[in-house]
Amino acid sequence: MTVTDDYLANNVDYASGFKGPLPMPPSKHIAIVACMDARLDVYRMLGIKEGEAHVIRNAGCVVTDDVIRSLAISQRLLGTREIILLHHTDCGMLTFTDDDFKRAIQDETGIRPTWSPESYPDAVEDVRQSLRRIEVNPFVTKHTSLRGFVFDVATGKLNEVTP
Protein backbone atom coordinates (compact mmCIF):
# COMPACT_ATOMS: atom_id res chain seq x y z
CA MET A 1 0.00 0.00 0.00
CA THR A 2 1.09 3.55 -0.69
CA VAL A 3 0.73 6.65 1.45
CA THR A 4 -1.85 7.81 -1.11
CA ASP A 5 -3.88 4.66 -0.42
CA ASP A 6 -3.73 5.42 3.31
CA TYR A 7 -4.94 8.96 2.66
CA LEU A 8 -7.79 7.70 0.49
CA ALA A 9 -8.89 5.46 3.35
CA ASN A 10 -8.79 8.49 5.67
CA ASN A 11 -10.99 10.35 3.20
CA VAL A 12 -13.79 7.83 3.69
CA ASP A 13 -13.98 8.84 7.36
CA TYR A 14 -13.70 12.53 6.50
CA ALA A 15 -16.46 12.37 3.87
CA SER A 16 -18.83 10.55 6.21
CA GLY A 17 -18.99 13.60 8.50
CA PHE A 18 -18.51 16.29 5.87
CA LYS A 19 -20.69 19.38 6.29
CA GLY A 20 -20.94 20.91 2.84
CA PRO A 21 -21.30 22.58 0.57
CA LEU A 22 -19.63 25.74 1.83
CA PRO A 23 -19.80 29.10 0.02
CA MET A 24 -16.93 29.69 -2.43
CA PRO A 25 -15.67 32.99 -0.91
CA PRO A 26 -13.75 32.51 2.34
CA SER A 27 -15.92 33.61 5.25
CA LYS A 28 -13.10 35.49 7.02
CA HIS A 29 -12.08 37.32 3.79
CA ILE A 30 -8.41 36.47 4.24
CA ALA A 31 -5.70 34.94 2.06
CA ILE A 32 -2.63 33.32 3.59
CA VAL A 33 0.58 32.66 1.68
CA ALA A 34 2.73 30.04 3.41
CA CYS A 35 5.71 27.82 2.83
CA MET A 36 4.89 24.26 1.77
CA ASP A 37 7.01 22.82 4.60
CA ALA A 38 5.19 19.85 6.15
CA ARG A 39 5.94 21.12 9.67
CA LEU A 40 3.58 24.07 9.15
CA ASP A 41 -0.01 23.15 9.93
CA VAL A 42 -1.42 26.50 8.91
CA TYR A 43 -4.97 25.58 9.86
CA ARG A 44 -4.10 24.47 13.41
CA MET A 45 -1.51 27.19 14.12
CA LEU A 46 -4.05 29.91 13.33
CA GLY A 47 -7.24 28.10 14.36
CA ILE A 48 -8.70 28.23 10.84
CA LYS A 49 -11.83 26.24 10.09
CA GLU A 50 -12.92 24.96 6.68
CA GLY A 51 -14.22 27.72 4.46
CA GLU A 52 -12.62 30.60 6.38
CA ALA A 53 -9.45 31.37 4.38
CA HIS A 54 -7.59 30.85 1.15
CA VAL A 55 -4.26 29.16 1.84
CA ILE A 56 -1.68 29.47 -0.96
CA ARG A 57 1.52 27.45 -0.51
CA ASN A 58 4.82 27.07 -2.29
CA ALA A 59 8.47 26.42 -1.51
CA GLY A 60 9.66 29.25 0.73
CA CYS A 61 6.47 31.35 0.73
CA VAL A 62 7.97 33.16 -2.25
CA VAL A 63 5.71 35.82 -3.80
CA THR A 64 5.96 34.61 -7.38
CA ASP A 65 3.85 35.55 -10.40
CA ASP A 66 1.64 32.57 -9.62
CA VAL A 67 1.11 33.73 -6.03
CA ILE A 68 0.18 37.17 -7.38
CA ARG A 69 -2.27 35.48 -9.78
CA SER A 70 -3.88 33.58 -6.89
CA LEU A 71 -4.05 36.68 -4.67
CA ALA A 72 -5.59 38.77 -7.47
CA ILE A 73 -8.30 36.14 -8.01
CA SER A 74 -8.81 35.81 -4.24
CA GLN A 75 -9.27 39.56 -3.85
CA ARG A 76 -11.01 40.58 -7.04
CA LEU A 77 -13.37 37.64 -7.49
CA LEU A 78 -13.78 36.20 -4.00
CA GLY A 79 -13.60 39.24 -1.75
CA THR A 80 -10.56 38.68 0.45
CA ARG A 81 -9.32 41.83 2.16
CA GLU A 82 -6.48 40.64 4.40
CA ILE A 83 -3.20 38.94 3.50
CA ILE A 84 -0.86 37.05 5.83
CA LEU A 85 2.60 35.82 4.80
CA LEU A 86 4.00 32.84 6.76
CA HIS A 87 7.70 32.09 6.50
CA HIS A 88 9.42 29.92 9.12
CA THR A 89 12.70 29.16 10.85
CA ASP A 90 14.89 26.31 9.60
CA CYS A 91 13.51 26.67 6.06
CA GLY A 92 15.01 24.57 3.29
CA MET A 93 15.27 27.72 1.15
CA LEU A 94 18.08 28.84 3.48
CA THR A 95 20.22 25.79 2.63
CA PHE A 96 21.18 26.35 -1.01
CA THR A 97 21.82 28.99 -3.64
CA ASP A 98 19.84 29.39 -6.84
CA ASP A 99 22.93 28.91 -9.01
CA ASP A 100 23.99 25.69 -7.25
CA PHE A 101 20.47 24.25 -7.47
CA LYS A 102 20.08 25.11 -11.15
CA ARG A 103 23.55 23.75 -11.91
CA ALA A 104 22.74 20.44 -10.18
CA ILE A 105 19.56 20.08 -12.23
CA GLN A 106 21.43 20.90 -15.42
CA ASP A 107 24.15 18.37 -14.57
CA GLU A 108 21.49 15.69 -14.06
CA THR A 109 19.14 16.49 -16.95
CA GLY A 110 21.22 18.47 -19.43
CA ILE A 111 18.72 21.34 -19.21
CA ARG A 112 19.13 24.46 -17.06
CA PRO A 113 15.81 25.57 -15.54
CA THR A 114 14.49 28.88 -16.85
CA TRP A 115 12.78 29.57 -13.53
CA SER A 116 14.40 30.73 -10.33
CA PRO A 117 13.98 28.77 -7.09
CA GLU A 118 14.37 32.11 -5.23
CA SER A 119 16.34 30.78 -2.27
CA TYR A 120 17.28 33.30 0.40
CA PRO A 121 19.79 33.61 3.25
CA ASP A 122 17.52 35.34 5.79
CA ALA A 123 13.84 34.53 6.43
CA VAL A 124 13.05 37.86 8.10
CA GLU A 125 14.47 39.85 5.21
CA ASP A 126 12.60 37.66 2.74
CA VAL A 127 9.33 38.42 4.54
CA ARG A 128 10.11 42.12 4.03
CA GLN A 129 10.91 41.47 0.35
CA SER A 130 7.64 39.56 -0.04
CA LEU A 131 5.64 42.33 1.61
CA ARG A 132 7.20 44.87 -0.76
CA ARG A 133 6.42 42.70 -3.80
CA ILE A 134 2.76 42.73 -2.86
CA GLU A 135 2.68 46.41 -1.88
CA VAL A 136 3.95 47.54 -5.29
CA ASN A 137 1.93 45.10 -7.38
CA PRO A 138 -0.85 46.77 -9.41
CA PHE A 139 -3.02 43.63 -9.47
CA VAL A 140 -3.20 43.03 -5.71
CA THR A 141 -4.59 46.27 -4.30
CA LYS A 142 -7.84 45.41 -2.54
CA HIS A 143 -6.42 44.50 0.88
CA THR A 144 -6.91 46.46 4.08
CA SER A 145 -4.27 44.49 5.98
CA LEU A 146 -0.95 42.97 4.84
CA ARG A 147 1.24 41.37 7.51
CA GLY A 148 4.18 39.00 7.54
CA PHE A 149 5.38 36.49 10.12
CA VAL A 150 8.12 33.96 10.78
CA PHE A 151 6.86 30.77 12.45
CA ASP A 152 9.36 29.26 14.88
CA VAL A 153 9.42 25.51 14.20
CA ALA A 154 10.99 24.88 17.64
CA THR A 155 8.39 26.75 19.73
CA GLY A 156 5.29 27.00 17.53
CA LYS A 157 5.18 30.77 17.99
CA LEU A 158 4.62 33.38 15.28
CA ASN A 159 6.91 36.40 15.24
CA GLU A 160 5.67 39.41 13.30
CA VAL A 161 8.09 41.09 10.91
CA THR A 162 7.98 44.86 10.67
CA PRO A 163 8.27 46.17 7.11
Swiss-Prot record:
GO molecular function: carbonate dehydratase activity; zinc ion binding
Catalytic function, reaction form: hydrogencarbonate + H(+) = CO2 + H2O
PTM sites of type N-acetylthreonine: T2
Cofactor note: Binds 1 zinc ion per subunit.
Full protein name: Beta-carbonic anhydrase 1
Enzyme class: lyase
A Pfam family assignment: Pro_CA
Entry annotated with the keyword Zinc: yes
Other notes: Was identified as a high-confidence drug target.
Subunit structure and binding partners: Homotetramer.
